[in-house]
Each structure stands twice: as structure tokens, then as C-alpha cells.
Regions:
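Glycine-rich ATP-binding loops of the HATPase_c
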Residues: 134-145
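Short beta-to-alpha transition helix within the HATPase_c
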Residues: 3-7, 19-37
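Conserved glycine-/histidine-rich ATP-lid loop and adjacent helix of the Bergerat-fold HATPase_c
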Residues: 126-135
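Glycine-rich/acidic phosphate-handling loop/turn and adjacent ATP-lid/helix
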Residues: 93-125
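Short beta-strand/loop element within the Bergerat-fold HATPase_c
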Residues: 81-91
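Conserved ATP-binding N-box helix of the HATPase_c
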Residues: 56-80, 130
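Glycine-rich nucleotide-binding loop
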Residues: 103, 143-150
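Conserved short strand/loop->alpha-helix "switch" segment adjacent to the catalytic nucleotide/phosphoryl-transfer site
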Residues: 15, 19, 40-62
């Protein structure tokens, strides 16, 4: 009986424990949603929680928008995949979110593909503003049906 309860708890509550509550909450929530939608999710979370150059407010803006956009882009896709990476390396901290996405309108630039459910078009602008406020920058790419956003912030900011 206790095995059944533990299995039930584990299957309902996929938890990430990096030590940063904002990251843990957003990525754990993404895990649950991706699992329920049949979206493959890969995470790479290697950073020191004690020396992040992005405060909780800006981390919430950046992760909230990027993960929401990735999840929305993957809904109703076959073989959908999302990759989330947060890493401290050398002098920089990077957040990289990539997802499968087939562009149906070739005239649009990658910056135009934002979640329609999240304040219609302000998501990526807010991500860019937060990155710049923290002394960093944002790179948006779309190649080979993979849409990705990378935020890089110097560790000294």
C-alpha cells in the first residue's frame, strides 16, 4: 500500500531541487505540464544558487515567459521537445530554452512568435528588458524547426 502511495506522489509531483525557489517552481511546473501533454523535456541545471546575477523578480519574468512560450509552441505538435538549460560557466550565467516549432508563416521574424496566451506580444520584450536590466542580452534563433532563446548575463552584474 505504501508503495502505491509513493508511486502516486512521485508521478504527480515531479520536483526540481536546485535550491533556487523560482527556478524550482517554474521547471517543476513545466515538467508536469510537458508530461501531461506528451512533450519530451530535457533539463540541464548547473549553477550556483548563491551567486546568480539575476534576482528573483527578473528570473520570474525570464523563465515565466520563455517556458510558457515553449510549452504553447509545442502543444498539438507531434514529437514535440523542449530543452531548458540554466548554467554558470566562466564569467557568465546563461538561460537557454529551445523547442521544436514549425513556422507556418515564413514572413515573420523569430521575435514575432510569442505566446498568444500571455499578454499578447509583451513576453519576449519583457525577457529582453529583464536581460538588459541585469547587464546581459538576449539572442533569438529559429533554425531547422528549432526555436530557441538564450539569455546571457555576466556573473559580475
Amino acid at each position: 500500500y505504501s508503495r502505491e502511495i509513493m508511486h502516486d506522489l512521485e508521478s504527480r509531483y515531479c520536483t526540481i531541487n536546485t535550491g533556487n525557489l523560482v527556478v524550482d517552481a517554474f521547471v517543476s511546473n513545466l515538467l508536469l505540464q510537458a508530461k501531461s501533454l506528451g512533450i519530451a523535456l530535457q533539463t540541464d541545471l548547473k549553477f550556483d544558487k548563491d551567486i546568480l546575477p539575476i534576482n528573483d523578480y527578473h528570473m520570474t519574468i525570464i523563465l515565466g515567459n520563455l517556458l510558457d512560450n515553449a510549452l504553447n509552441a509545442c502543444k498539438n505538435q507531434l514529437n514535440a521537445k523542449i530543452k531548458v538549460s540554466l548554467r554558470s560557466a566562466d564569467d557568465n550565467f546563461s538561460i537557454h530554452v529551445a523547442n521544436t516549432y514549425v513556422i507556418t508563416s515564413p514572413d515573420k521574424a523569430p521575435e514575432d512568435f510569442e505566446s498568444t496566451d500571455f499578454i499578447h506580444g509583451y513576453g519576449l520584450k519583457n525577457v529582453k528588458n529583464s536581460a538588459e536590466t541585469c547587464g546581459g542580452f538576449c539572442v533569438i534563433q529559429h533554425e531547422n524547426d528549432i526555436y530557441s532563446v538564450t539569455v546571457i548575463v555576466p556573473m559580475s552584474s
